[in-house]
Amino acid sequence: MAAASAPERGDVVWLQFNPQAGHRPALVISPRSYNKRVGLALVCPITSRIKGYPFEVELPPLMETESAILCDQIKSLDWRVRNAKRIGSVPPSVMQEVTARILALVAPEE
């Protein structure tokens, strides 16, 4: 992904989280229009340490190892400073599942 090309919702990107987490993949959940205008992107980290937690969504075969999207660990990051590099994208069904899990956290039906 070129430095001027903002990531799109549904993109899987490699980025630098911080010194402790290092480079790792993440799913972009904010739309390109927001990412481009603000310079930030909302992302969910991706892990290969699948634990079966309710807010994990299994990632389709895209990574070398089985991986899961951590829907309860949303981060807002400067995608340029974090050197985001697009490595693929998820199908709409995965984005729908991620969105449903996030909504269960922020707008639970009571």
Where are these regions (language model features)?
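Conserved functional hotspots at enzyme active or ligand-binding sites that engage polyanionic ligands
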Residues: 1-110
